[in-house]
Amino acid sequence: MPTKRFDKKHWKMVVVLLAICGAMLLLRWAAMIWG
């Protein structure tokens, strides 16, 4: 069974991945607008 510490670390990793995906989408959007 996963511990609370593991859950916190997993949640933090998911947030970081979502932030990276969002940044990449914003960069692609800006490139389409400026290009």
Curated annotation (Swiss-Prot):
Q: What is its main location?
A: membrane
* Topology within the bilayer: Single-pass membrane protein
One GO CC annotation, please? membrane
Expression triggers: Constitutively expressed (at protein level).
> Which compartments does it reside in?
Membrane
Please give the InterPro entries that the UniProt record associates with this protein.
YniD-like
From the record, give the transmembrane residue ranges.
14-34
Keywords assigned by UniProt, alphabetized: Membrane, Stress response, Transmembrane, Transmembrane helix
**Can you say what this protein is called?**
Uncharacterized protein YniD
| Organism of origin | Escherichia coli (strain K12)
